[in-house]
Amino acid sequence: MLTFISKAQQIPITSQPLSNAYLYNPAAAGVQGYIDITLGGRQQWTGIENAPRTYYLYANSALGKNSGKDFSYLSLPVSNPGYYNQLAQSKPKVKHAIGGRVFADSYGAFSESGIGVDYAIHLPLKEKLYLSFGLGLQASNFYFDRSKAQVLDAFDPSYDQFLSGKESELLFNGRFGAYIYTDKLRIGYSINQLVQNSLTGETSASAYQGQKIHQFGNVSYRFDLNKIGLTPSAAILFAPHSPLSIYGGLIFDYNRLFLISAAYRNDESIVFGIGFTALKIFRLSYTYDFPMGDVQKVSSGSHELLLKVMLNRKNASDE
């Protein structure tokens, strides 16, 4: 029981990392050209008792309008008073963004629920090219359900000491991220769980029970071919004492309304997805992870459903 948790990823895994960039990286807040409200859920390894389940809700948006200051006082009365305003508005400006998230994650006898807030600043490097930095704070409640614990050795002193700890414990943590982006390119890197908290009752035999730093990186680029869009992407998640998670995928969409996707994850699973956009503000997408290798013998796969609401979306190219 303790071994399983010690070697598991401690932040949720998603099969839609491109749509869920903010879930991993606070610097992704405000990258989209709209107010992004996302609700998602994932059932992993269907068919396995007490398999991981994840639910999340988050929202993020840039603040204010991307407009310049009033420079008309620099113009002589006989000239064009609006010239300097037009010039100022044509230049990219520093942007600020905020975001918030709630989540619930369960895996076997352990569950975690939490809430987080994030801030990001977006610095213009050149026209349409931005570099953003983000910081986030998070409060998480960890719960251990003794009734679901399966122990091979009931007289294990490490397990007895772990049981002497709290069933429920509140921990605080933080995260940091950076993002480079244009209207087509996305490159991100983030560090989650900056504080390596320990759980009460943790022993040297369960040294990885506490929160560990998780590093996440992603890259994607969109190619527009008339009404057809092709977006190859890759993501990597690294955590101490856990297998390296590598994701590579391709999204095909028509007129940004309908999409299909395929991806491969190095944990021996192939991912297939479909999605559509309705009324220009709602996007519903579903992915199925087809297991391969030994997992296929005990699981029928993983399912993930995501609903995105895109408010104040100026045009269809805002992604």
Map each language-model feature to its residues:
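Sec/Tat signal peptide C-region and signal peptidase I cleavage site
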Residues: 4-8
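Subset of outer-membrane beta-barrel
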Residues: 9-319
